[in-house]
Amino acid sequence: MFLINGLEQNTLAVNDRATQFGDGCFTTARVVDGRVQLLDTHLARLQSACERLAIPFERWSTLGDEMTSLAQRQQTGVLKVILSRGAGGRGYSGSACDTPTRILSTSAAPAHYARWKEEGATLALSPVPLGRNPYLAGLKHLNRLEQVLIRSHLEQTNADEALVLDSDGWLTECCAANLFWRCGQDVYTPRLDQAGVNGIMRQYIMKRLAPTAYRVVEVNAPLSALAQADEVLICNALMPVVPVQRYAEQQWSARELYRYLAPLCESPD
């Protein structure tokens, strides 16, 4: 179902800047037992994105209530929230927009993640690099053409997910997930100050590992860094964390970090 500006409907104004320019941001949350997992973190992500994009959205309490209400109706599955600058005007200027648009939708949970958790995911290198833009890096904005192309190429392989580099050749993320790899007690994840999305589960994992014996390091690393890894994981808010079993000729069977994180990520609140 769709909830647009508080009303159940599936019609959006054709001059909304979400469709005209991808002028907005979004977040995708996991719903379990009628509750939005990490609700406050999702709201904080949207608020931070709106501030950076200069979208004057102010109805945060209303949005939180709508997310909570839809989750209670959905019980289990996925809740997506989109915020756009709104409708009005023409051209790139958003000065004619005075009311941001909020769109909430629900859907079933992805079924394939259960298999990935049991067997481990397989990765393939994407030929599509991410452009480097420090102003937009980290944001889950509505401009997702890179991911559309990455996904299109991935569907031509037998892999489950894509390893994605930025235009300088640094490991950045997967198509729809963040990346971690472990070498002994050191846990590495790509820096996201130039490209990529700072995912909700990435943030949660880094927070949970901070007081442990594991040392979390954000790095600029080449693809070859994975050859030294004892273990590789991918994560997003829906998975929420999955072990990687193979990339090209490299295979990983260790599950130490995964076994530690899995129960924490399944019930993060």
Per-range role (PLM):
Residues 78-83:
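ATP-grasp fold ATP-binding core
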Residues 1-68, 72-73, 84, 89, ...:
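Helix-start/capping segments and mature chain N-termini
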